Amino acid sequence: MPYDRRQAKSILTDIGMDFNSYHACPNDCILFRHEYRDTTECPKCGKSRYRQDVQGDRVPAKVFPIIPRIRTMFKCKRIASLMHWHKNSRSTDNVMRVPADSPAWKHIEEKWEDFKSEPCNIRFGLAMDGVNPFGLCSSTWSTWPICLVNYNLPPWLAIKKGHILLSLIVLGKYKVKSMDVYLQPLVGATL
C-alpha cells in the first residue's frame, strides 16, 4: 500500500494509469486545454475561468488517457484473444443477446465496412450517471463518472469490474450543463 497520495500517483503512472486535469468554463462551454490552455476567460461566453467567491469553486475534470489502458489489454494474451469474441464466438441465431446482435451494430458495420473488416477494432459503450457521493439530498455537490464498456469482450466479462474503463470524472458543486465538452478528450483519443 502506498504511504501517501504522491506515492499512489507515482505507482499508477508507472503502470500507465495516469490522469490529466482540465479546467472547464463555468457554463460548460469549453475545456481550457490545447489552444485555450493559457486563457483566463471563456472565448464563447466571456466568463472567467476562476471564480471570485469560495462557495462556487469548480474542481478540474480528471481525464484518464484511454490509449495506454487499451495497450495494456492487448498485452495480456488471454484478454487479447477474447477481443475477437464478438466476431468469432457469438451465436448467429438472430436472437438479440448482446449489443453485437442489435440493429444499431449491424447499421454501423454496413456504414463503415473498413471498421467491420478488422475484428480488433474496439466497440465501446459509454456509461455515465451523476451521483451524490455524500448521500445528502440537500447537497449541491455533483460527481459524474464516465465509463467505457468494451463490447468486443464476451458479455460475462464486458461488465465485470476489471474490464470497465473509467475514462473521466467530472467533479463540481453544481450539475453539469453540457456533458459534450467533457467528452472531447475521450473522442479525440479514440478516433
Task: Identify the function of each model-found stretch.
Residues 1-191:
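Long, charged/polar, flexible scaffold/linker tracts and peripheral helical/loop segments
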